[in-house]
Amino acid sequence: MTFARAHRFALVSSLLAATALASSSLIAACEDRTGGDEPGHDAAALDSAAVPIDSGSDPDGDAGIDAAEAGGCPAGSTFRKARTTCPGAALPPPAALTTALGAAARGDVVPMAGMDVSTAPCLPVVVCTPNDAPTMLFSDSPEAPSQDGVLYADTVPAGRYRFYVYHANGGASLRKFPIVALNQGAQPAKITILRRGLAAPSTAYVSVGKTVLLDWLADRAPAVVTVPAATRVLLDDALDQLHAAQNELVHAIYDVTTDAPLKISFVSVPAATDAAAVTAGLGLLTRDVSHQRGTFPAADVLIAPAPPSGAAQRKGVQRLRLGLDEVDDTLEGVDAPTGVKQLLLGNYGMLYRVALGLPSPATAAISARGGAWGGAVRTGTTTTALPTATEQLATTTDAVVVGSLGGADGGAELHLISGGGSNLPIDLFFVTP
């Protein structure tokens, strides 16, 4: 996974100044193993026409959060930041783009007919944290281990969690990367798996990422894992059975709830090893310098219209830039075994819940701004790979269609997530006739 290089360096510099974190605390974003940014992308510099970024704590510069700003968050969520300064008229879409969008299905790639979406004004929104947002345990460092050991571990209280596994086999023998849960209490504990995304190990990393997302977004019956007192168990036998050959990727995402404190360990062991039996004797593997691991609270973000309701939408093109701190702040967390602060640049594993309630019909699409991008979206019960016919959106001159929204189904909520191996940021833009 790659956060476009120039965007990453610029963002790291600003975060250093803002937070005074030591340079050793900053771990670069997950790297795409294909070797960096794809040709034709604007990773060399930030868009010169980008509008200013609002302050998360004081969006209108009045030394406080107005009731109207905070009140824009729906019930069941809390205010995170406002993105309400969106100067300029909406960008008129080229006629060819409007025609292409009208004929396209969700997941189709369409040419933008010369339109530079970065010149469009933003859509005024408030950004909220859903009350049920999980804390994410993220394991991607060392990304390609060849030895046995603990990749990441944390002891967490009862609650809601997302477990994110992203590791390739750096050795010659078959290897697996299961999750092991330890109950250190005196009573049995339960883990309820609400969502699970898996794919067969492969060297086609982007394809693996999209397959995992589609599986994770699909409906499934909850599965309960019982962890007896003073016992270690596998979270999921299916993950334990994913045996990677050299350079193959194992990727998995789980959303779970737990009813008691548990120690969660992500481990690297040979394919034939009983992971639950050996975890207690495994040492912690050292993080590599290019990837991340850690525990990150609030891994879902809810994007809602800025108040007053219905006033933000204009005819033409408006956009939301995701993955560059304009809308979604970079997730902050900690590498629990070492205590080192972490920044999850690119916010991989974050679910964007977009609930705009647009009063007028519009078509939503995505433009890649930092490199080739792929992901998945769910509306209602329909889940779609983005893009559908190809692995990734490969240029800045095309867009992938997210679908129609607003008007009669203005209350529909989009669930959008970027795939492993993708580059960020992206522009989610809206075309209102």
Located regions from the model:
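Short, solvent-exposed loop/turn segments enriched in Ser/Thr/Gly
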Residues: 170-178, 248-252, 348-354, 409-412
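Asparagine-centered strand-capping/turn motif at beta-strand->loop junctions
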Residues: 167-173, 180-193, 256-258, 358-362, ...
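A eukaryote-biased signal for short, well-structured alpha-helical docking elements
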Residues: 96-154, 290-329
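Short acidic, flexible loop segments centered on an aromatic residue
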Residues: 169-171, 185-213, 364-377
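Terminal connector regions
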Residues: 242-280, 422-433
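Ser/Thr-rich, Pro/Gly/Ala-heavy low-complexity intrinsically disordered linkers and tails
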Residues: 25-78, 82
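C-terminal functional regions that serve as terminal interaction/effector modules
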Residues: 86-118, 357-433
